[in-house]
From Swiss-Prot:
Protein name (Swiss-Prot/TrEMBL): Cytochrome b6-f complex subunit 6
InterPro entries: Cyt_b6/f_cplx_su6 (IPR007802)
Signal peptide range: none
Alphabetized SUPFAM superfamilies for the sequence: PetL subunit of the cytochrome b6f complex
Membrane topology: Single-pass membrane protein
Annotated TM spans: 4-24
Organism: Triticum aestivum (Wheat)
The protein's assembly and partners: The 4 large subunits of the cytochrome b6-f complex are cytochrome b6, subunit IV (17 kDa polypeptide, PetD), cytochrome f and the Rieske protein, while the 4 small subunits are PetG, PetL, PetM and PetN. The complex functions as a dimer.
GO CC field: chloroplast thylakoid membrane; cytochrome b6f complex
Localization in the cell: Plastid, Chloroplast thylakoid membrane
Function: Component of the cytochrome b6-f complex, which mediates electron transfer between photosystem II (PSII) and photosystem I (PSI), cyclic electron flow around PSI, and state transitions. PetL is important for photoautotrophic growth as well as for electron transfer efficiency and stability of the cytochrome b6-f complex.
Gene Ontology molecular-function annotations: electron transporter, transferring electrons within cytochrome b6/f complex of photosystem II activity
Length: 31
């Protein structure tokens, strides 16, 4: 159970970082 929770946490963190980078690149491209 703990491994599943940590796996989902890691997946969520990776998704958040990817989304943040994507938004950052889009903002830089707009400027």
């Amino acid at each position: 159970m703990l491994t599943l929770t940590s796996y989902f946490g890691f997946l969520l963190a990776a998704l958040t970082i990817t989304l943040a980078l994507f938004i950052g690149l889009n903002k830089i491209r707009l400027i």
